[in-house]
A protein has these predicted regions:
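Active-site glycine-rich loop that binds ribose-phosphate moieties when present
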Residues: 14-48
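Short coil/turn connectors at secondary-structure junctions
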Residues: 10-14, 50-51, 126-128
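Short, glycine/charged-enriched secondary-structure capping and boundary segments
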Residues: 9-10, 30-32, 69-71
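Conformational coupling and interaction surfaces
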Residues: 37-41, 56-183
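Short, conserved beta-strand edge motifs with alternating hydrophobic and charged residues
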Residues: 17-18, 54-58
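Aspartyl protease active-site motif detector
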Residues: 6, 46, 114
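Single conserved hydrophobic/aromatic residue that forms the stacking wall/gate
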Residues: 1-8, 12
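Short, well-ordered, mixed-charge alpha-helical segments that flank or form enzyme active sites
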Residues: 6, 22-28, 62-66
Length: 183
């Protein structure tokens, strides 16, 4: 039953979200990650209401990088699909040269969240009750909820480690197969 009166937590047993930054700085301010920063109040409500949510934040997504080495493999396919993927990704990599030149590639933010939704073993998590700061200088910061630190039940997991080789290998295999078939 997906009636409007039911919440996500009632319909889905486990949720995975891409957003936040717990152990690293944000990407739109020293504290806030872009997705959470768009609506900190909504994200805070999600963290307080859902019982099993996994946060895939910058802590791990910036460890899963695509570089020009990967895009060269798509270009080498000689297919329109490979050329498109390479051009689009190279554009994204170039944007990172301005915003985060130290990374040497572009983060796979949303793809990693999808990967974890399919295979939670891709990441190492810590259990925590989360909140989002909704006011002041730290607005948009994802952090442990000090009012629930001692609660026995932890309602969130935050990814703090990622099996990047396994994730990148599967990501590249799937997209390369698609790009090769797109003629």
């Amino acid at each position: 039953d997906r009636s409007p009166s039911r919440g996500l937590g009632d319909v889905y047993k486990r949720q995975v979200m891409m957003g936040g930054a717990l152990t690293v700085p944000g990407n739109v301010s020293p504290w806030a990650e872009a997705n959470v920063n768009q609506d900190p109040e909504a994200t805070d409500a999600i963290f307080r209401r859902l019982k099993d949510i996994t946060m895939i934040g910058l802590d791990v997504t910036l460890q899963t990088l695509l570089t020009v080495d990967e895009t060269a493999k798509w270009e080498a396919l000689g297919t329109p699909g490979g050329d498109f993927l390479a051009a689009a990704t190279n554009y994204y990599i170039d944007a990172y040269k301005t915003t985060a030149p130290h990374l040497g590639g572009c983060g796979l933010h949303d793809p990693l969240a999808v990967g974890v939704a399919i295979d939670p073993s891709l990441v190492e998590t810590i259990a925590i009750n989360l909140k989002v700061d909704t006011e002041g200088e730290t607005r948009g910061r994802t952090i442990g909820d000090e009012t629930r630190l001692n609660d026995e039940e932890k309602t969130a997991k935050v990814a703090v480690g990622v099996d990047k080789q396994r994730f990148l290998a599967e990501f590249m295999r799937r997209l390369t197969d698609l790009a090769a078939a797109a003629k």
